[in-house]
Amino acid sequence: PAAGPAPGGPPPEVNGHPVADVLDYKFYTYDPKLALVLQEPNGNRRTVRVRKEEGEDLGLEFETYLMDRARSCANNCIFCFVDQMPPGMRKSLYFKDDDARLSFLMGNYLTLTNLSQREVERIIALRISPINVSVHTTDPELRCEMLKNRRAGEGIAIMRRFAQASITMNCQIVSCPGINDGPALDRTLRELAGMAPAVNSISVVPVGVTKYREGLY
């Protein structure tokens, strides 16, 4: 226990790599031989060498699971189920997450609209796979209209980069009658199939509508 990190300290540096969040931690601690650089409360740094089974967790616990805040959604989708929630529910149900880390770790779906170039490259470099993508349409203009985000059309190009890097993707399409069904859906299915085998699955689900839609699309 005395050799471990001090409670409340920063994440350890692993094999020369700084750890920014849980993805870095899981990726860099997978190896059986690790050199951890720990920072003491007085600011001194020391190195601890660890031997373990490949993939075995070190058992460190962090203040939050992601080691920072979950990234929130930057879209205003015309079919958003969170916007149709009844009032008076617990606060966490109204949080719209759109975080690549939660996609990989928890199976959440993301739209790719708030990923920076650096984050795209990080997903490829760390082999973060599979990820679940809310696609809805591969038509860039229509996707911008549906997600109400001017960056939404860039998502398909990002998916093609992931496909070229062999990042596995599970895709979801929320089918909205008269908007992204019919010929638009045919195009989406055709273009997603063209990214196989990286596109592992495609699910088409009907849009859900509740009575709490005042002021919505």
List each language-model region with its residue ranges.
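Short conserved beta-strand and strand-loop elements enriched in small hydrophobics
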Residues: 32-40
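Conserved PDZ fold ligand-binding element
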Residues: 1-20
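Conserved Radical SAM active-site core
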Residues: 42-48, 52-198, 208-217
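Short strand-coil-strand connectors
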Residues: 14-15, 39-42
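Solvent-exposed segments in extracellular or luminal domains encompassing
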Residues: 26-30
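Terminal peptide-recognition signature
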Residues: 11-13, 36, 80
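Short, Lys/Arg- and Gly-enriched loop/turn segments at beta-strand edges
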Residues: 19-25, 44-48
